Amino acid sequence: MNIHEFGADKNKIIVLIHPSLVMWDYFEYILSILKEEYHVIVPALPGYDEENPNENFTSVEEIADNLLGWLKEHKIEKVDLWYGCSMGGSIALKMFSNHGVKIRNIICDGAITPYQLPWIVTRMIAIRDFLMISIGKIGGLKLLEKSFSTDEYSEEELKYVAKVLNFISYKTIWRTFESCNNYVMPKNVSEHSGRIQYWYGDKESKARAWDIQYMKIHFPNTEFIKFENMGHGSMASLYPVKMVNQFRDLMEVKK
């Protein structure tokens, strides 16, 4: 797994985990700002790394373990902010529960939490999602343009998604949904001295209802932040300055 680092001479550390169907450069706009102030670590997740097109996505658990191993190898014992979006939020949450490194603050942006449903139901959901994305992979840009509103996604953004869909494997698509829906979390999560935030856009409120309920039950100290006029995972590309300011506000607050 390739790990990209920026601003390594800075003191405060931020880890950014990208969502599915994009690459690590999803964070391009905020990286140009963050690297001037922070040491930023961005993994290129297996299956979504254009430099390693023969790799497949493994699992939420395995990636979290590999990231922990990398941090220990580089003698990083504390992370000031761990951010993950959607699939990346699943990995961030799993990493947080491992307690292998001190995470002072965590943001789960539209994070997918493990379904609390019977096994057969979760597999049916995974099959539905797999088929939907696979059809997009086959149909390419023309199908994406018909399926997504041009008011929310520009032509360039749709071309980017089509590019990613073109090189990722069907195995990666399947494992992404199967793992994000069913990764294993500890039954009891110990108290955390930092802050936990769950972000979601008002346009995805219904889709995130189960995830929000999960966080309320298993992480009762979570702060829920709803952003108006936003969909799923749209802040990094559409509102990078606002996103960076949210990061600063979270890290700089006195505990």
Residue ranges and their predicted role:
Residues 6-53:
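Conserved HGGG/HGGXW glycine-rich cap/lid loop of the alpha/beta-hydrolase fold
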